């Protein structure tokens, strides 16, 4: 679970130093996401419904599936309920691993400048979609470049 620690630093730095309108991270973060969604879809978590829906629609337009996953308060509580740390980087058990990983990351998204609300943020877990074992209409076998098209469409509208 060391990758999520580096990603957490990146989220915090981006939010605090760059004053973004929104933050989107992509990572081959959890095997649990592969168990949940296989190799057909990336998991998508967000603290902002509009951003989540825009990413989902951009992905659909490009043939890249981003499947919304839950960020229940129980997952956040699990990550902040510790006798020795402010925030845990692993859930208490093996269940819901991709959800608790996203809940961990959410803890490091700061509030916007002059705002009491977190910067809109989305996390795409591409563990199951970053590498293709078979050719499809978008890519041959190997590295897929998953969600480059999605993000391009989201940003440019093209």
Language-model features, listed with the residues they occupy:
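A generic structural signal for tightly packed, nonpolar segments enriched in small/aliphatic residues
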Residues: 1-158
């Amino acid at each position: 679970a060391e990758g999520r620690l580096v990603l957490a630093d990146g989220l915090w730095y981006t939010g605090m130093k760059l004053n973004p309108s929104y933050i989107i991270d992509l990572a081959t973060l959890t095997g649990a996401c592969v168990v949940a969604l296989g190799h057909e879809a990336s998991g998508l978590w967000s603290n902002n419904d509009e951003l989540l829906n825009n990413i989902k629609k951009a992905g659909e337009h490009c043939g890249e599936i981003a499947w919304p996953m839950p960020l229940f308060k129980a997952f956040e509580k699990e990550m902040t309920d510790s006798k020795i740390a402010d925030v845990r980087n692993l859930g208490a058990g093996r269940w819901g691993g991709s959800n608790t990983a996203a809940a961990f990351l959410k803890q490091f998204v700061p509030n916007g400048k002059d705002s009491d609300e977190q910067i809109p943020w989305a996390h795409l877990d591409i563990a199951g979609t970053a590498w293709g074992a078979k050719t499809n209409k978008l890519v041959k076998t190997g590295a897929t470049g998953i969600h480059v098209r999605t993000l391009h469409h989201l940003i440019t509208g093209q």
